[in-house]
């Protein structure tokens, strides 16, 4: 319904702690928390921003939250989360592998999540192959795309994603965050 899937909102009770760790990205956190509470999640997210702003880390936090992955397990170790660097895997065959695997339900989590970093590096053929799956996504699949160059992502892909523009976190906000962590850990900092 309208590109958003309706899920049981109670399935996500108490698992948004990782989202709270996304300091300086209040709009993204608020939007995702509201989507989780209402049970209406987009099937594809697009994270944009300059290099080093935290797009890949944010993608992993979103994946951890959606699939309720415990802190003791790395997101990259989870069998229902697949991460692909489009800079190294630009071709249509790489995307077709994902599309083929996406047909199968997740093994141990609510969703199969595909994180595609540097998505703007995909070839035209790869984008075209991906488009059909984005138009009619399996209910158990979520895509998280990250890019530094939004202009290179076709509008047909952009229009099927919920977009978040990540901003560099202000130094004062970071400083306050580190002070809070140090205080909780009983560590003194200058």
Task: Give a label for each model feature.
Residues 182-190:
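Short, intrinsically disordered, charge-balanced linker/junction segments flanking boundaries
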């Amino acid at each position: 319904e309208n590109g958003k899937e309706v899920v049981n909102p109670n399935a996500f009770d108490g698992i948004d702690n990782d989202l709270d760790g996304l300091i300086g990205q209040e709009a993204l956190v608020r939007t995702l928390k509201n989507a989780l509470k209402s049970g209406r999640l987009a099937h594809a997210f697009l994270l944009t921003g300059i290099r080093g702003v935290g797009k890949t880390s944010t993608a992993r936090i979103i994946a951890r939250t959606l699939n309720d992955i415990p802190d003791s397990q790395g997101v990259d170790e989870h069998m229902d989360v697949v991460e692909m660097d489009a800079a190294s895997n630009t071709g249509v065959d790489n995307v077709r592998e994902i599309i083929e695997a996406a047909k199968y339900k997740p093994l141990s989590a609510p969703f199969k999540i595909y994180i595609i970093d540097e998505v703007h590096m995909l070839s035209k053929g790869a984008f075209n192959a991906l488009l059909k799956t984005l138009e009619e996504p399996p209910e158990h699949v979520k895509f998280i795309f990250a890019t530094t160059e939004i202009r290179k992502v076709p509008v047909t892909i952009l229009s099927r994603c919920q977009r978040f523009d990540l901003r560099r976190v202000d130094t004062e906000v970071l400083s306050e965050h580190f002070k809070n962590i140090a205080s909780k850990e009983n560590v003194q900092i200058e």
